[in-house]
Amino acid sequence: MTKTKPTCLTRLRKRLAKMREIKILLASGNLHKVREFSGFFSELPPFGDAKLTLISPGDLSCAFPEVEETGASYEENALLKAAAFARAAGMPAIADDSGIEVRALGGEPGIRSARASEGSDSDRVNWLLDKMKGIRDRGACFAACLVIAFPNGKNIFGAAERDYFSAEGRCFGTLAESPRGTLGFGYDPIFTPDGYGATFGELGDEIKSRISHRAIAFKGVAQIVPSVLKYIAVHHNENCNGDLGRCTN
């Protein structure tokens, strides 16, 4: 009886089964983002027996660069961070860039949201509220772009013009007159998403993880997880304990 030659998918699944846990690096040390992204990744289904797991820079012994966000868009800034961290760690990395866009301000502060004012998140919230004093149109949206990059820049996504993957998400709502709630971070205490009577600062992680700009962008990321796993399986180094990196953890 002639044996059937294993298909590429069968061979891939066998290799993934040996790996069990596959790691991808979050290109941020922000503890709020680590928590938020960890929640996103925990909801991903396994591919065969392999699971894509998020790790943070604090889990590795690498020295990571300070990345200046000099891009002209969320995507460019996210790519700068993802590519730099991927090269430093020798493993795939995911990064995001985000901002709040206020209709009455022509989309500002946008990509400058994190640098719109010196000081803390609270200082930036107060800066924006001052800018909006006396303005009745409170329409705004949170925007985010997520990027996955690889250390060698190899294109695995079928897009000849680029060597990374990106996905965008937007969450529309209105600006509150004053901060409400102590949950979340950034501009969360003054952003009320459409369909809700509370700010992100009041709603908490359970709701935010379903409707936020990053959550919407991550749905696009989730669609290409099989491609990410396939790439890692093909390039997997058996001495790396399941990840594609040169750092230890």
Q: What residues fall within each predicted segment?
A:
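Extreme N-terminal basic, low-complexity initiation segments
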Residues: T2-C8
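Anionic-ligand binding patches
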Residues: L12-L16, R20-L25, L31-P57, S61-N249
